[in-house]
Every structure is written in structure tokens, then in C-alpha cells.
């Protein structure tokens, strides 16, 4: 670029800083989606992603300054961008090569997510971090106004980061998919590098080396199926997959959100509930209401629509309202999971916002099934949300919640008992078995101002299951309820309460 006028060169330097910063944030946002099928999405996952990429960026900034002080020119910028493109493209192959051994290791979820991010995204972050200080130094050779040049470059880097964040999060992920974004970013980095490599002397060996690297990257990625997208659909919230199930039950399909099977739908009969916690919720409603044929249901969370589908099939005169955050989930349930949305009112939006908008509605049963794996929307665990539910319930209505927590000392479940007890007379916790070793477990919590629950609940239909009321056992063992907080909008330390799931093998 030596033939350009200084103003044009400075403009191109600024554009490169803007774009390289944007690409780094594109990778950061995509990292969360790319890793979701393996480690899910949680505060700790995002902490690993942000921390590793910032560490790489910091190291890259330091290296860029050192390289610039040694007199590096535009060719160094081009080489850095080209190597960054290769590192970016290699993410797809590395993911598949790292996934199998890492998933087989007995590491905590926190360690696993950190290793994934470090292996895949640290090097691209370092390389892209080199660009800004290197180009800032080159710009200062053309414009001696240090403050203006440095300020402009920092501003462009920040604006690029903002643009990359919003473009990826709001549009790219749900439009083209995460793996396509990775490939497009690598190609864009190559194109960005080319003008800086104009003066680079490609000797025969160097040109051959570049070709070999490109062929090797593409071949390895194809060999390990790195180009294959594991998601049937990618939305703004989930990587969605549908898995066919074969067994004595007949044709069945399961919905997988990120890395966890959410629920399983049997084609016929629709009211056969295979997932134990969904079955438990259904049986609790039937125990509470001897004649459930005309009940008014509100479901917070649709997912595979397993429970709403069963209710509507069994009781056509029941009123069923479902709040589902993600329209793509509803689309997949309708097209792939035997769900017929007719006669069910579906409101797409956050469950708390939707329920708040139904001020003139009253429900006999409110079923909250939104706690996906360990990604728990804290605002649906607080006393303010429970108070809202209470205002929408019939006087003796039933409130049901499923919660993923550790066994045998589920501190989040206990905190929810304490929080719910301030609003409801009877609060009970249900499990279908007691594991022999510490592990993760799905609990069902019921709350009502109506009748007390039994100590044991036998299934009246479907699989021959029994659920046990362990409320008193939880209160008498492990962490005391008095040592746990009542959850509120102001203070709901969900991640701390379920930290055992992140820091031990029980969370895997």
C-alpha cells in the first residue's frame, strides 16, 4: 500500500482495525452457540468464553506492540490476518477432534467448558489482538498527532466490536448458522489480508506451503465432519435437534435443546408421557383435581409441547394456554414432533411477561417447565414471580415447577421451598427415585393453598411409576433452609446454589 496517499492509507488502516475487532466479537458470540451442544449455556460457560477471549486479546495486544517496535510493516499485518484466518477455519476441525476425548473425561462442567474455549478460540483471539497495536503504530508514522490517531483506532476497535456483537447475535446466528459464520469469517480475514500482502514475495516454496495448508485444513475438516451442522435449526436461543426413538412405545421423537434432551413425544397415543418429571406433573394435577376435564392450564414453556399435547388429546374441553419464548421451538414441535397447535393458545414471549399481561385470566394449574438443564432463568424463581402466579391461580389452584439440581443436597430446590412457603400453604418436592451416589436430578416442586399432598403418588395412567414426597427429608438433611436465601428479583444467586453441578462430575 506504499503507493496510496496517506489519507487513503489511514482510512484503510482504520477499516482493518474496525473489521478485525468485529470478527473477534463474531467469534465470541458464535462460541456460545458452537459449544452449546456439548456443554450447554450458562453463566459459567459465558464467563469462560469472555475470559479466554479477553486473555487472548490482551496477549495479542502486547505482542502487536512488541512486533511494531521491531519495525514490522504492512506485510506483518497481512501475515497475521492470514494466519488468523487459518486458525479461525481450524476451529471446525478442532471442535470435532477435541469433543470426543473431552466428553469422555470425567471433568466438571466448568473445566470442560474452559478447555473447549481455550482449545478453539484462544489462538484466533491472540492473532486478531495483534492487529490493532500494529496498525496504530503504522498510522503514527503517517500522522504524528498521537492522541488523535490512538483515540481514533481505539474508537474504531470498540465500534467494530459493537457491530460484530449486534450483527451476530441479532441476525447471523439464526439466519445462516454458527458453522457457516465461522467459514465466512475465515474467508473475510483472507480477503482483508490480501492488500497487505501485495509486497510479499511469494517464492515457490511459500506458495506451495500455503496451498498445502489450505488443502490440509479443508481435508481434515471434511474427514472429521467439521462442516456438518449438528442443529436441525438454530434460533436466537437454542441449537435444536430432533432424534428418532425406537422401542416398544412405537414411533417416537425427542427434542434436544443444545446438549440436553428436553422431552419425548410418542406419535400415538399422544397422552403417553415417557419423561418421568412430565408424567409426575400430569399425575399431580389429576390428584389435585379428581375431574380435570375442563381445567384451565397455563404452561410456562412449551418445548416439545409434550404435556400440553397430552392434555388437549385427553381432555378436548380443557383450556390450554402456552407461553413459549422461542417461535422456532414451536415450529419444530409442529413440523417434527407430532404436535397439532390447533385448540391450544400459544403466546410467544417470556413467561413472566406473558403471564403478567393476562390480568383478566384465572388458571386452575400453572405449570412452569422452563428450567432447561442448568440454564435457569432466575426471574422465574423469585418471590415476585411466585406472587404473580398466585394472583393468576384459582383460590385452590396448583402450581408446578421442574428444577434441575444436585442430589442429595439440592440447595436451589431448598431455597425455592423457602421462597414459595411465603406465598403458599403447602409446598412439596417430588422424585421418582433416590440415586445411590451424588448426581444431578430433576425435581418437581408443587405449591398450593388447596389440599395437602400425599407422601407417595402412584401413576394412574401410563408407565407404572411412583413418586415420593421428600420435602421433610430435605428440610432435615444437608444445608438448613435457614442458611439459604429467599429468592427475590434483587437477590437470586442461582449459579452459586447449583455450583456443585459446575464444579463436580455430578453436573455432567
Language-model features: locations:
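Alpha-helical transmembrane segments of multi-pass membrane proteins
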Residues: 1-234, 244-251, 259-264, 286, ...
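SAM/dcSAM-binding transferase cores
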Residues: 445, 449-508
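Short, solvent-exposed loop/turn elements at domain surfaces
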Residues: 250-253, 262-266, 454-456, 482-484
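Class I SAM-dependent methyltransferase Rossmann-like catalytic core
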Residues: 264-288
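Short alpha-helix immediately C-terminal to the canonical SAM-binding loop
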Residues: 330-331
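Short, conserved SAM-binding/catalytic segment
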Residues: 334-344
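Short, solvent-exposed loop/turn segments at secondary-structure boundaries
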Residues: 268-269, 377-380, 411
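Short acidic active-site motifs
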Residues: 354
Amino acid at each position: 500500500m506504499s503507493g496510496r496517499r496517506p489519507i487513503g492509507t489511514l482510512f484503510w488502516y482504520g477499516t482493518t482495525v474496525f473489521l478485525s475487532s468485529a470478527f473477534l466479537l463474531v467469534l465470541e458470540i458464535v462460541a456460545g452457540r458452537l459449544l452449546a451442544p456439548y456443554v450447554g449455556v450458562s453463566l459459567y460457560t459465558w464467563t469462560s468464553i469472555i475470559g479466554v477471549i479477553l486473555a487472548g486479546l490482551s496477549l495479542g495486544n502486547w505482542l502487536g506492540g512488541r512486533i511494531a517496535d521491531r519495525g514490522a510493516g504492512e506485510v506483518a499485518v497481512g501475515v497475521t490476518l492470514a494466519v488468523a484466518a487459518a486458525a479461525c477455519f481450524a476451529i471446525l476441525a478442532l471442535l470435532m477432534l477435541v469433543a470426543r476425548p473431552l466428553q469422555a473425561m470425567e471433568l466438571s462442567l466448568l473445566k470442560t467448558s474452559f478447555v473447549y474455549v481455550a482449545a478453539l478460540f484462544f489462538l484466533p483471539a491472540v492473532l486478531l489482538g495483534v492487529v490493532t497495536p500494529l496498525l496504530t503504530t503504522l498510522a503514527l508514522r503517517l500522522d504524528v498527532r498521537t492522541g488523535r490517531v490512538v483515540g481514533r483506532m481505539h474508537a474504531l476497535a470498540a465500534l467494530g466490536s459493537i457491530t460484530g456483537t449486534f450483527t451476530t447475535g441479532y441476525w447471523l446466528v439464526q439466519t445462516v448458522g454458527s458453522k457457516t459464520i465461522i467459514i465466512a469469517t475465515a474467508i473475510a480475514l483472507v480477503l482483508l489480508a490480501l492488500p497487505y500482502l501485495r509486497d510479499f514475495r511469494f517464492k515457490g516454496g511459500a506458495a506451495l506451503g500455503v496451498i498445502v495448508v489450505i488443502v490440509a485444513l479443508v481435508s481434515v475438516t471434511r474427514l472429521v465432519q467439521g462442516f456438518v451442522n449438528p442443529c436441525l435449526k438454530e434460533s436466537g436461543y437454542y441449537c435444536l435437534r430432533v432424534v428418532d426413538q425406537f422401542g416398544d412405545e412405537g414411533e417416537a421423537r425427542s427434542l434436544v435443546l443444545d446438549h440436553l434432551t428436553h422431552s419425548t413425544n410418542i406419535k400415538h397415543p399422544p397422552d403417553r408421557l415417557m419423561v418421568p418429571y412430565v408424567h409426575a406433573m400430569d399425575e399431580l394435577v389429576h390428584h389435585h383435581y379428581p375431574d380435570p376435564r375442563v381445567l384451565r392450564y397455563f404452561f410456562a414453556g412449551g418445548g416439545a409441547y409434550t404435556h400440553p399435547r397430552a392434555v388437549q388429546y385427553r381432555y378436548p374441553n380443557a383450556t390450554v394456554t402456552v407461553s413459549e419464548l422461542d417461535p422456532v421451538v414451536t415450529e419444530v414441535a409442529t413440523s417434527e414432533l407430532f404436535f397439532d397447535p390447533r385448540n391450544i393458545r400459544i403466546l410467544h414471549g417470556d413467561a413472566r411477561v406473558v403471564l403478567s399481561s393476562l390480568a383478566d385470566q384465572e388458571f386452575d394449574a400453572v405449570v412452569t417447565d422452563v428450567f432447561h438443564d442448568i440454564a435457569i432463568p432466575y426471574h422465574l424463581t423469585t418471590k415476585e414471580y411466585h406472587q404473580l402466579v398466585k394472583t393468576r391461580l384459582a383460590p385452590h389452584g396448583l402450581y408446578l415447577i421442574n428444577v434441575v439440581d444436585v442430589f442429595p443436597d439440592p440447595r436451589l430446590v431448598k431455597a425455592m421451598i423457602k421462597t414459595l412457603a411465603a406465598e403458599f400453604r403447602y409446598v412439596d418436592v417430588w422424585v421418582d427415585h433416590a440415586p445411590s451416589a451424588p448426581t444431578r436430578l430433576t425435581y418437581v416442586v408443587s405449591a398450593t393453598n388447596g389440599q395437602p399432598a400425599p407422601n407417595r403418588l402412584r401413576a394412574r395412567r401410563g408407565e407404572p411409576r411412583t413418586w415420593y414426597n421428600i420435602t421433610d427429608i430435605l428440610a432435615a438433611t444437608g444445608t438448613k433452609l435457614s442458611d439459604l436465601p429467599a429468592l427475590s428479583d434483587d437477590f437470586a444467586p442461582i449459579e452459586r446454589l447449583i455450583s456443585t453441578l459446575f464444579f463436580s462430575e455430578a453436573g455432567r
